[in-house]
A protein has these predicted regions:
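Motif-centric detector for short Cys/His coordination patterns
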Residues: 1-79
């Protein structure tokens, strides 16, 4: 009997911030939280600039144009 692994891609659907953390909500309802310390440009950005984000493709990552920052969901899951 053979089995094969099914790769399910985690996709972001929303981004929020707390005072010290970036929080990414995934399509399956899971949430990833990471300290802003890991992302110096986001940490230094104003709250208004942090909320000006867009998804990369179908949600494989998040892009902040004004902050010049891109973060992939895969990198957050690997951390």
């Amino acid at each position: 009997m053979s089995t094969s692994a099914v790769r399910v891609e985690a996709l972001a659907v929303d981004v929020t911030f707390t005072e010290h953390n970036l929080r990414v909500v995934l399509a399956d309802g899971c949430e990833i939280s990471a300290p802003l310390e890991w992302f110096p440009r986001l940490k230094a950005a104003t709250p208004e600039k942090r909320t000006n984000w867009r998804l990369i493709g179908p949600g494989v990552g998040v892009h902040w144009e004004e902050v010049d920052e891109d973060i992939s969901v895969e990198s957050l899951l690997a951390a």
